[in-house]
Amino acid sequence: MQTAEIHRRWLDFFARRGHTVVPSASLVSDDPSLLFTVAGMVPFVPYLTGIVPAPFPRATSVQKCIRTLDIEEVGKTPRHGTFFQMCGNFSFGDYFKEQAIAFAWDLLTTAETEGGLGFDPKDLWVTVYEEDDEAREIWRRVSGLAEERIQGLGKDTNYWSTGQPGPAGPCSEIFFDRGPAYGIDGGPATDDDRYVEIWNLVFMQFLRGEGTGKDDFEILGDLPKKNIDTGLGLERVAFLKQGVENMYEIDQVRPVLDRAAELAGKPYGNEAHEDDVRLRVVADHVRSALMLMTDGVTPSNEGRGYVLRRLLRRTVRAMWLLGVEAATFPALFPVSRDAMKAAYPEVETEFARTSQLAYAEEETFLRTLVAGTSILDTAVANTQKAGKRELAGDTAFLLHDTYGFPIDLTLEMAEEAGLSVDRAAFDTLMADQRARAKADAKAKKTALADLSVYSGLRALGETVFTGYTELETESSVLGLIIDGHSANKAVEGQVAEVILGATALYAEAGGQDADTGTIVGPGYVLDVLDVQKPVRGLVSHRVLVRSGEVGVGVPATSLVDADYRRGAKQAHSGTHIIHAALRQVLGSNAHQSGSYNKAGYLRLDFSWNQALSPETRSEIEEISNSAIRQNLEVTTRELPLAEAKALGAMALFGEKYGDTVRVVDIGGPWSRELCAGTHVARSAEIGLINLVSESSVGSTNRRVESLVGLEAFKDLAVERTIVSQLSSSLKTPREQLPEKIADLMASLKAAEKRIQAFEARAVLDRVQGLLEAVSRRGAVQVVAADAGTLSTADDLRLLAITVRDRLGSDPATVALAALAGGKPVVIVATNQAARDAGVTAGALAKTAAGVLGGGGGGKADLAQGGGTDATAIPAALAAVSTAIG
């Protein structure tokens, strides 16, 4: 039995029993806590938990899912796959245990000729929660199974909850016995390999309390409405019904496996276990990547895009290990498309886009593999030869930095060779690289051409910084640099670097951005674009000559933009305060790893490995603003380095220290750091700290961003305006806005679900009218009709299948056309008798699509075509009738 046929039988079975057929949701979940849709129940969670009233009492679906938690197990077991389809039937306060169990047993054991799945009852076993006597008795009565074939298991396997207070309940699982060749007797409680779980029935009937783990929680009582949530693994049933060994060999996956084996010249199943695993990885990952890209995911270095990129790269490497070093995606992805398009036509309509994404990713990564694999192989061999078990961190860094080899791939390949990787050394080298990148950025800012130019000017003496105590300093021009070379003068319109004997302008350092301002002198005005320290002790001012002419040796007065400096001081002192607050809340392990501040804005990176909760963010913000309200004194002093360390001053800005360092105290010892930046005199001068963002900047670092001073007040004013407008528009007091908006969102989602259900019912309401339009072409019943305008091709497909199945066992063909998504689409469905008479849906769909100005095709029982000419729909339907005979 083909996978698509099992899919169809599932939906038909439950549709005939009053369930609303709900199309699969996207793999990209609406739930912000999930990267992907990971289970069939995910789209129904609001209904199952009671957050939103269900728009229907019963529902059924076949849901696309992605799980990559066990990605390393793919190909090694018969059951692990990254993409899978979960068949589900759901009851929202309607039927409960008895009906759910009866439905399951009926569908599984009804003969294939009567629309069931045709499992022999003697091959089926059942597990129930050990204390659920009700379920055990129902199974005994409904199935007639012997007592020993209904096994009671504990909470860890047969009790469902969300892991937190809320709905919970026992579950019952149905297993298929593959026979003694696969393991020992004794049922599912004894051996997982022999007994394959195919269906899980969850009986949501209780309210659970606080607790940890799978079984350490209290049951508080019954739920007011009892729900049913079941899941049957489509791929698992398919491999059992198709008589193959695992899910990689079913009709939707095996074609890719065979094509990969053909490309590699290594037949599948020839006892070469490692090669078979790699072929299964290719088959699984190609299908998963194709489905992800069809649902809009694109390769990237973070989030969903990174998961996709990893799947694609693992596929490339698996083919590489099979001996194929050329591009294979152009041969593999069309095969997967053809295997999946009958169930998901969007796979074909989106293929031009998705295939180009895949092919480009493969081309890029092949270059990486060519360069990096030989180096890694050599390093692994040398490590093993030396009797070591850990690959050096500098090797992993070289692969990452020079060849673009992702660290997760290095870890994976090293593990395959029985080695670990010195991750700590790798992380240190990455941190050093970031520091060098920062230095390179500084070099670009100062337009470095030859350090000797700066060194020569440095020989004249260090630049004296006066900006701690004044915003205006008189000095003289010691040197000029234009395009990296010394110059005697700069004229109006030129960009130059100016070296002064003394300056009030702060050069970028310690995370603080450079000051803005001007330099003026006799007959000239210079706008300061940037201020840097190209060599130790020398300050370079990058300027635009606004007017006049400036030459070496002339007097010069540096003028700091007072407003900018005020904002910069607020931000830098605010950084120290937030850092102290972070450590107060999170502990001493949360220490600063980087920062950047400029007028009105700061960001602070700190060592921490998980996101901060909203409550933690609020606490940090409150402690910070409390320090501002206390108007703490800010003092600076210069001390010997050893004395500063003895006082507990923290070294943060990553520069090499001299014997004497500058210590900044805020509120005495409350905050004490080594710092060369500019600061307010008292904390109240900061005004306000407004934490606006918290995010990840690596596996062990987080980043907070904040507005300070005037910018913080401006941001709050904008928020206040927005809140006021919302309050007015929604006629709701502002303190009730969150609840009101949540209610509106819930109502909107409920309305959308009701619309979907209404549209599905509206489609099915057309069935009787179409049945009355049946005609005959020879011995074949024919329904060829224009269905008007529908939301999606899925609606048209459901309508065609339903009409076909209602036409009975005599030869029947249904051809329906409609405008779906603004384009003409035709669906052709044939029953077995029509196919026996030589009428195939694929050929008819291709005929109709040709008239519509497009293309089409599919399988003998169900096919789709489309085009661009909607006016040709009548002619296309006529062509189908003519082609039948």
UniProtKB/Swiss-Prot annotation:
Zn(2+) binds at H572, H576, C675, H679. Its cofactor is Zn(2+). GO terms for biological process: alanyl-tRNA aminoacylation. PROSITE patterns: AA_TRNA_LIGASE_II_ALA. It is found in: Cytoplasm. SUPFAM superfamilies: Class II aaRS and biotin synthetases, Putative anticodon-binding domain of alanyl-tRNA synthetase (AlaRS), ThrRS/AlaRS common domain, Translation proteins. InterPro entries: aa-tRNA-synth_II/BPL/LPL (IPR045864), Ala-tRNA-lgiase_IIc (IPR002318), Ala-tRNA-ligase_IIc_anticod-bd (IPR018162), Ala-tRNA-synth_IIc_core (IPR018165), Ala-tRNA-synth_IIc_N (IPR018164), Ala-tRNA_ligase (IPR050058), Ala_tRNA_ligase_euk/bac (IPR023033), DHHA1_dom (IPR003156). GO terms for molecular function: alanine-tRNA ligase activity; aminoacyl-tRNA deacylase activity; ATP binding; tRNA binding; zinc ion binding. Transmembrane segments: none annotated. Its main location: cytoplasm. It catalyses: tRNA(Ala) + L-alanine + ATP = L-alanyl-tRNA(Ala) + AMP + diphosphate. The keyword Ligase applies. Keywords: Aminoacyl-tRNA synthetase, ATP-binding, Cytoplasm, Ligase, Metal-binding, Nucleotide-binding, Protein biosynthesis, RNA-binding, tRNA-binding, Zinc. The keyword Ion transport does not apply. Pfam families: DHHA1 (PF02272), tRNA-synt_2c (PF01411), tRNA_SAD (PF07973). GO terms for cellular component: cytosol. Binds 1 zinc ion per subunit. Its EC number is 6.1.1.7. Belongs to the class-II aminoacyl-tRNA synthetase family. Consists of three domains; the N-terminal catalytic domain, the editing domain and the C-terminal C-Ala domain. The editing domain removes incorrectly charged amino acids, while the C-Ala domain, along with tRNA(Ala), serves as a bridge to cooperatively bring together the editing and aminoacylation centers thus stimulating deacylation of misacylated tRNAs. Catalyzes the attachment of alanine to tRNA(Ala) in a two-step reaction: alanine is first activated by ATP to form Ala-AMP and then transferred to the acceptor end of tRNA(Ala). Also edits incorrectly charged Ser-tRNA(Ala) and Gly-tRNA(Ala) via its editing domain. This is Alanine--tRNA ligase. It comes from Leifsonia xyli subsp. xyli (strain CTCB07). The gene is alaS.
